[in-house]
Amino acid sequence: MKERRRDPRVTEENKVVLTLIPEGAAPAPKQTHYSLTKDISMGGIRIMTDAPLAVGARVKLEITLSKSRKSIQAVACVRWVKDLFGKDVYDIGLEFVEIGSADELVLIDHLYGKGEPKT
């Protein structure tokens, strides 16, 4: 089977705070969920969460990168959802649709940089 991803993924756990971006003009109550990444790439992340997000939903992400302990922010779109344990836990694929250039550089360094010098 041909790999459809554009970017290689790195398997690692990073803390994620995700906030659902409401659709339409009417304000909606803020929905914030906490999660961990299962993998991460320049194009997106895969998370495990108890939040039943819909395909196509947009979320704000704050990701704390485990190796560097730096945080990045991005907006992502839900691309796929898989039930893991009935309707209690979900595996969700998120594609970054907005990420600032400074956050993008932090992510590049995190994924491809040599990391912190050892002392």
What are these model-predicted stretches?
Residues 1-40, 112-119:
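N-terminal helix initiation/capping motif
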Residues 12, 33, 59, 72-74, ...:
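Hydrophobic core residues within well-ordered beta-strands of beta-rich domains
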Residues 16-20, 58-69:
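Short conserved beta-strand and strand-loop elements enriched in small hydrophobics
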Residues 21, 42, 81-86:
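Short, conserved beta-turn/loop elements at beta-strand boundaries and strand-helix junctions
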Residues 24-55, 60-62, 93:
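Short strand-loop-strand
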Residues 26-27, 54-55, 68-70, 84-86:
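Short glycine/serine/proline-enriched coil/turn segments at secondary-structure junctions
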Residues 35, 73-82:
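Short beta-strand-centered aromatic/proline hotspots
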Residues 89-107:
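Short solvent-exposed strand/turn elements
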